[in-house]
Design a protein with these regions (language model features):
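N-terminal helix-turn-helix
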Residues: 1-74, 234-242
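Amphipathic alpha-helical regulatory segments at dimerization interfaces
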Residues: 23, 74-86, 137, 173, ...
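Cysteine/selenocysteine-centered motifs that mediate thiol-based redox chemistry or coordinate metal-sulfur cofactors
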Residues: 142-154, 230-247
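A structural signal for short hydrophobic beta-strand segments in well-ordered beta-sheet cores
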Residues: 44-46, 93-94, 197
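Extended hydrophobic
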Residues: 159-232
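Amphipathic alpha-helical effector-binding/dimerization core
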Residues: 49-50, 54-151
Length: 247
């Protein structure tokens, strides 16, 4: 509750401990303990010369990440909703955090079963279509840093890459086809296709995906679904400022 206090979030706090103790209605000794914990985790930094505290690097990074994620979500909502309406399949948008993806939007189609990809859910990026779409658009050295050895690979269903070499092959196929795929890697009986969403820096800021019951689509339906997914990914990237080739 202390962290949510509206007057705590200032870039600098003059006479920090006294001000915070008064505003929060807690003893100064408790304030010192809280500030030490926040400083230890990089959330605040001590400004000795000014006898004050400022926002730490971790807080700045979290704020920047939230700002980016919030904008992506706002822009993506209508695009994803229309895609789900057009295809009749469940859709979602996810962002990369470490070697996991976090689902930030989920749009459920009518008469389709619920998925594990609810908003806020984290899953290993190497197993998900959204994660693979993002990873395939990152520099290879960045992917290797996220997945340096076999120990970095977790498993859900026994399917999916289990080593850096296998992941590299999976991502190479994604780059070749322009689509990331997973077939029961996350949940048995469900398949997903995904594309990377890029921002104005040509950075893969998110993955856009559709998930459907395995074997429920005819080949021509799958082709149509992929086409609509690609067009939606291109539109969303354009809306986020991407200007390069997105085909």
């Amino acid at each position: 509750p202390y962290a949510r206090h509206p007057r705590v979030h200032r870039e600098q706090w003059s006479d920090a401990s006294h001000t915070l103790a008064r505003e929060l209605g807690i003893p100064r000794s408790t304030v010192y303990q809280l500030l030490e914990i926040l400083e230890r985790h990089g959330l605040v930094t001590r400004l000795a010369e000014q006898r004050a505290y400022g926002i730490g690097l971790k807080t700045f990074e979290l704020g920047s990440a939230y700002s980016r994620q919030h904008r992506v979500s706002q822009v993506a909502h209508p695009v994803l909703a229309r895609l789900v309406d057009e295809t009749g399949e469940n859709g979602h948008l996810a962002v990369l955090h470490g070697n996991e993806i976090i689902y930030v939007i989920e749009e459920r189609a009518a008469h389709r079963p619920p998925l594990v990809s609810g908003v806020g859910v984290r899953l290993p990026s190497h197993l998900t279509a959204t994660g693979r779409a993002i990873l395939s658009a990152l520099p290879r050295n960045q992917v290797r840093a996220l997945y340096p050895n076999r120990q970095a690979f977790t498993d859900r269903t026994g399917i999916g890459p289990k080593s850096p070499k296998e992941l590299e092959a999976t991502l190479a196929e994604t780059q070749r086809t322009g689509f990331a795929e997973e077939h029961g890697d996350v949940t048995p009986g469900f398949d997903s296709y995904a594309v990377a969403v890029r921002d104005y820096n040509d950075f893969p800021i998110a993955g856009l995906a559709l998930t459907f019951v395995s074997g429920s689509l005819r080949p021509e339906q799958e082709r149509s679904l992929k086409t609509k997914l690609r067009l939606a990914g291109t539109e969303l990237s354009r809306r986020l400022g991407a200007v390069g080739s997105l085909t």
